[in-house]
């Protein structure tokens, strides 16, 4: 173990990484699959046409695309641990809001508003969780748990696209009421995410290095924002060879 790893491990109020890495990255993957995949299936079952679904859901991916633009603000306000807990709470509220408004007359507009809330909350959660991963583990642990976190992120995708969609289908058949079936499914997701929020509230470690950036001025924040914005443009712009 290097001196850096030793100092790092001493600066973290220890928790066994197995107690929080799997659930943290499951919580990172589930809202993404809910917004990008389950929403499409749900709207189709609720009678929307393919054209309407494309129109309403095609922009929901935007928060994950532009999330680097507000990543400096995550460092400015509170700790990454606080952001994780807060965003998971908002995601749970998003699931509950969708569940509540599915049976209503204006369900499309109202549920879309909560899907947008979930999308921005989930993208912000990604920023905080990935940063917290670096703070909560030493170098050796970071290398070891890369595969673990990816596995549970993918498991969240399988759980969402497979088990939850199957559950909604079974409820449609057993209840004979499509809106009710999907409402129950989203209430269950809200309950699951609330449980994850409460669990992480107590189980996530408290790294001493997880602090908000002190002395960050408006000019420095603007500089970081512009650097990030330019980096995004350079990354997404086609090269002359691609043109």
Feature-to-residue mapping (PLM):
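Helix-loop boundary and gating motifs at the non-cytosolic
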Residues: 12-60, 241
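Glycine-rich segments within core transmembrane alpha-helices of 12-TM secondary carriers
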Residues: 147-164
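Juxtamembrane intracellular "pre-TM" segments in multi-pass secondary transporters
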Residues: 5-14, 208-234
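Cytoplasmic membrane-interface "Motif A"-like loop-to-helix N-cap segments
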Residues: 76-88
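C-terminal membrane-cytosol helix-exit motif in multi-pass small-molecule transporters
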Residues: 191-209
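Single conserved hydrophobic/aromatic residue that forms the stacking wall/gate
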Residues: 235-243
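Transmembrane alpha-helix termini and helix-breaking/packing motifs in multi-pass membrane transporters
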Residues: 159-179
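C-terminal ends and interior cores of transmembrane alpha-helices
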Residues: 89-105
């Amino acid at each position: 173990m290097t001196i850096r790893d030793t100092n790092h491990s001493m600066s973290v109020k220890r928790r066994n990484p197995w107690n929080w890495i799997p659930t943290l990255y499951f919580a990172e993957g589930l809202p993404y699959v809910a917004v990008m995949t389950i929403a499409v299936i749900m709207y189709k079952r609720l009678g929307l046409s393919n054209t309407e679904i494309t129109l309403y859901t095609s922009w929901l991916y935007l928060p994950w695309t532009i999330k680097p633009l507000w990543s400096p603000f995550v460092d400015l306000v509170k700790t990454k641990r606080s952001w994780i807990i807060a965003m998971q709470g908002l995601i749970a509220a998003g699931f509950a809001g969708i569940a509540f408004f599915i049976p209503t007359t204006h369900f499309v507009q109202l549920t879309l508003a909560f899907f947008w809330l979930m999308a921005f909350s989930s993208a912000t959660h990604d920023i905080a969780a990935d940063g917290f991963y670096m703070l909560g583990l030493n170098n050796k642990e970071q290398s070891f748990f890369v595969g673990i976190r990816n596995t549970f992120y993918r498991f969240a995708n399988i759980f969402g696209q497979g088990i939850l969609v199957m559950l909604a289908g079974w409820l449609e058949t057993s209840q004979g009421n499509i809106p009710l079936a999907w409402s129950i499914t989203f209430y269950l997701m809200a309950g699951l995410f609330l449980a994850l929020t409460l669990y992480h509230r107590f189980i996530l470690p408290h790294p001493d290095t997880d602090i908000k950036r002190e002395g960050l001025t408006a000019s420095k924040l603007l500089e970081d924002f512009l650097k990030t914005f330019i980096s995004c443009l350079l990354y997404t712009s086609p090269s002359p060879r691609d043109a």
